[in-house]
Amino acid sequence: MLIAQVCDFGNDGDARYRVHDPSRALGGLPGVTAVDCHFLSRFLPELIERADVLVLQFVMDWEMTGVCLRRRAAGKVTVFEANDYFFDLQPWNPIAGPWQDPAVQELYLQLLKLADGVQTSTPELARRWKRLGARNVAVFPNQLTSVPELSPAPQDRPLTIGWAGSPGHLADLYHLAPCLQGWLDAHPDVHLAVMTTEAARPFFNLPPDHYHFETFGSLDSYLQFLRRLDIGLAPLLPTDYNRCRSDVKFLEYASQGVVGIFADLEPYRESVGYKKTGLLYRDSPDLIAHLEGLRTDRDLRLALRQQGHAYVRRNRVLSNHIASRLSWYQGLLPKHDSNSSLPAEIAAHAVRDGGYLRLPPQEPERGLRDVMSTSAPAQASPALARLLEQSPQYLSALQHQGRLLNDLRQHRQALEVLERSRAIQPQSARTLAEIGRAWYRLNDDARALAALDHAITFNPHYLPAWQYLLRMLSVNQDADGPRRAEEAAKIFPTCYPVALLSVAAYPRERAPSIILEVLDRFGSSLDSNSRPAALSAFREAVLATVKAIPDSPELLPLLARASELFPESPRLVAAYGAALIAAGRDREGWEQHRRALALFRGATVAQDEFQNERTTPLPWELASHILKAGGE
């Protein structure tokens, strides 16, 4: 069996536990070849066609929706790995930007439904994914590849408590910092060690020789850090994101002989045996009581240390569980005798370890990645042209070059490049959508419509093609616009950008009632993370409608609802005030204008105080997050 995984390459915990370690273990099973392939690899199209099982690791590529459909028709299996609850990300988290993009969230919702199977890390995540329409959900908990022998408990150092975590978990530590600081002040014989991002260093004020701090690094450096600890903390605020996290910190602590005190939430309730393999706490006093008990009872520390290590070594080693993953894959396949072979060219370029192969970014992929990080098309396109001279069949590079040339309004050249792409993969919705865009810019609506229709026929779930099509139909006031808008709404029912884009496809006089319906449908689901982008999109749609049909009687209820849902927008509030005044409700209108003035003055003060700063101060974000979660 050929199993290919589309992924990025990393050396942190997630990369090891969820991506590379399982692939390596699968490749060690008889009759299995497992390949980790970078998402920009020039060999990916071939692997997509050949692999019996294709695993998608949070890839932000709408083309993968069509891959699911195409592979199912060919009797092959596509699995979506979804091991984080991406609807509740912390705003300061480095990955918050892309994951909070409504288009990315919609992509993941589509993949949950379109994939033949969804694999995840916890029962809580599996429950949520099933509720969102996922089929055949399997839980594969994180496992360790090995557990070292338990070394003797250190006796020649001060008792050390500690924590290590990624930036996304800063609030989990921050909300406990005051009570921990007080306990540490009361026990100067106890030391603290922390490993995370530099922003957390000031959370504690301790003498330098009592406080070890280091910035986060690789998984190996993290495991080395854990050997400093006697007691490890695992705080979690009761957020949706945290409830869906795995118990991997218990595995890491126990494997290194660290006694853990864990938040009494879903990730740890099943795996941590209370007072057998670790301790669970419900609030700050509970945590402090456990710390005090472990500080004064060395025998308890040693017992938990030994029992936790023994449990993990006996029950949580990957080699003892990997066969169940293979069995699940086999059960998804229409027939069990699938045995696709790996092309010789791919094998020759891969880094091989028995049945496990790695295709990390090589020279062409690194070149494309650099080009994609260049914001100016005028600089990126010539660099990509040079890369394509060396790798003329590199599909992702050809497609990106076609898009860049369209951005530069060099549409004839774009078509030449995109036709080369189509020759390699005729059913690529990405290629066809860019061809449609080029023809539209060349004023050939018939060819543009044909290309976009082909893209949607081959892959009805390719959102960018729908966006191009709806814009084109709206600009042309095409009579078919409303029908296509309704079709898009059925495919993307939870995507407000599609709903707003569809408004212009209808007759202009219907816009207020349609936007009002969209506001009612989506307004209650917006949280603090999604509001900024939603406010911008809805404000633009509402104010464009006010400008287009200023005398419509339906504007007043629309503006009332918009300013109710987005009371922080001075422009929406001001527009509502103007509409009230126009309707003869002067005093109510003046009240709204007074509100708008206060909002404007507040924004002016903030702009004056913060000048060019675009990042919210971290303590503010952490405090807001803690209070929202119900932290103490």
Language model regions located:
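Conserved acidic donor-binding segment of nucleotide-sugar-dependent glycosyltransferases
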Residues: 274-285, 293-298
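A charged, aromatic-enriched C-terminal amphipathic alpha-helix characteristic of glycosyltransferases
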Residues: 299-330, 334-336, 494
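Donor nucleotide-sugar binding/catalytic pocket of nucleotide-sugar-dependent glycosyltransferases
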Residues: 113-149
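Conserved catalytic-core segment of nucleotide-activated headgroup transferases in glycan assembly
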Residues: 5, 10-29, 143-149, 154-227, ...
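Membrane-proximal helix-turn-helix segments that form the acceptor-binding/catalytic region
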Residues: 86, 98-118
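Nucleotide-sugar-dependent
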Residues: 168-171, 219-220, 224-255, 261-272
